[in-house]
Design a protein with these regions (language model features):
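Conserved N-terminal beta1-alpha1 strand-loop-helix module at the mouth
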Residues: 1-151
Length: 151
């Protein structure tokens, strides 16, 4: 079993997670000034990712709105995995472009669990191009998929 911990706010948070044995650590990097409660500035995310280099799998939780914005983050931050959620939905062509520019970065996409039929259909669609699926909760009051406190 792998442990995955998200929403690092500081290098200190990341150090504690590493010491606790986390296998995968995620950071939501954004310059949107508080649109998401767990976001950190890209410069802070950069420092966290450098701390994680070679110690665990680093995951960029991107809330980028388009391919250009997301690729800019990948170029600067260089995580092991890109996790798409909230503002952008991947596609086979997005994954192809990503493989061309960033062959060593894997893609994870969140699939919101709603109804059984819709969720399975969406998971099968995303599985065509994503390296990982994250099956997650959906809330009417929280933007995007996950971090909703719904279990």
């Amino acid at each position: 079993m792998k442990s995955q911990i998200y929403s690092m706010q500081s290098i200190e948070d990341a150090k504690i997670c590493l010491e606790a044995g986390a296998d995968r650590i995620g950071v939501l990097a954004s310059e949107r000034c508080g649109e998401f409660p767990c976001e950190v500035k890209e410069k802070d995310a950069y420092e966290i990712f450098r701390l994680l280099d070679g110690k665990c799998t680093s995951i960029l939780i991107s809330v980028g709105r388009n391919e250009e914005e997301i690729f800019h983050q990948l170029e600067y931050l260089r995580p092991n995995v890109l996790h798409l959620c909230a503002n952008y939905t991947g596609s086979p062509s997005f994954r192809e472009h990503m493989r061309e520019k960033f062959p060593d970065i894997e893609l994870m996409e969140a699939v919101g669990i709603t109804t059984r039929e819709e969720s399975i259909k969406e998971a099968l669609r995303v599985a065509e191009y994503a390296d990982y699926l994250l099956l997650d909760s959906v809330s009417a009051t929280v933007k995007g998929i996950g971090a909703a406190g719904v279990t």
